[in-house]
């Protein structure tokens, strides 16, 4: 996924009210930008650290710039725009990067499914087979190279695991896809120490045939692209 304009370097001063952050630009001026991540962003926010902004090029927008990348406590770079994960995975599927998800005829987004009235992120289909894919953006690193999801208790994430298990029980292929937007993470696990209920459902889902796939993202100044498979533990 290529940005319309290259990212702009800045210094992160603080994040507040979940959706806002104050940053200092290279000319010394301070502006408020939109933070496109509603999660805890645990281990991602370091005050007075380098960050990168995306310019919407829309002067009428209340917050013209969005916080796209941050520097973590370990010095790694994290892409904190969780909404971009679906697009990254779709592009990687279409470009043949994700070998596990090739061979389908159609790709649909945000289709309604399941008893809990969810929307599947990606639905792949071919004659006599459907593949339901839930995409999760991973940015939490704890320990050297160890990535975890979720970074806070996630009842929504728990619901998605139940829905995937239901699809698998009906004979469909079901996939949980971890899109790792963090340059320091080399392996991913369910965060039992943060959300024990999610971790228990994760183990149950794996035992019932839900596939778990993790890939890392190359976080460039001009765009992002999924590049390599990572280990799930």
From Swiss-Prot:
Q: Name one Pfam family in it.
A: SfsA_N
**Superkingdom of origin organism:** Bacteria
* InterPro entries assigned to the protein according to its UniProt record, in alphabetical order: SfsA, SfsA_C, SfsA_N
Q: Which GO terms describe its molecular function?
A: DNA binding
Family statement drawn from the similarity comment of this UniProt entry: Belongs to the SfsA family.
Q: What is this protein called?
A: Sugar fermentation stimulation protein homolog
The source organism is: Saccharophagus degradans (strain 2-40 / ATCC 43961 / DSM 17024)
């Amino acid at each position: 996924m290529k940005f319309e304009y290259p990212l702009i370097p800045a210094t992160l001063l603080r994040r507040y009210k979940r959706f806002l952050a104050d940053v200092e630009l290279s000319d010394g001026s301070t502006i408020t930008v939109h933070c496109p991540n509603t999660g805890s962003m645990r281990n991602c926010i370091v005050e007075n650290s380098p960050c990168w902004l995306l310019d919407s090029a829309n002067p009428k927008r209340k917050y013209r710039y969005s916080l796209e990348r941050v520097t973590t406590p370990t010095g790694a770079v994290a892409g904190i725009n969780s909404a971009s994960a679906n697009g990254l995975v779709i592009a990687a599927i279409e470009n043949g990067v994700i070998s596990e998800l090739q061979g389908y005829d159609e790709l649909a987004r945000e289709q309604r499914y399941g008893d809990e009235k969810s929307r599947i992120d990606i639905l792949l289909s071919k004659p006599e087979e459907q593949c339901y894919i839930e995409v999760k953006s991973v940015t939490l690193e704890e320990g050297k190279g160890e990535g975890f999801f979720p970074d806070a208790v996630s009842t929504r994430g728990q619901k998605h695991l139940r829905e995937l298990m239901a699809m698998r029980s009906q004979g469909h292929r079901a996939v949980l896809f971890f899109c790792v937007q963090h340059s320091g993470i080399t392996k991913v696990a369910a965060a039992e120490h943060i959300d024990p209920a999610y971790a228990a459902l994760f183990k149950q889902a794996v035992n019932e045939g839900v596939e778990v796939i993790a890939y890392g993202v190359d976080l460039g100044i001009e765009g992002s692209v999924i590049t390599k498979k990572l280990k799930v533990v």
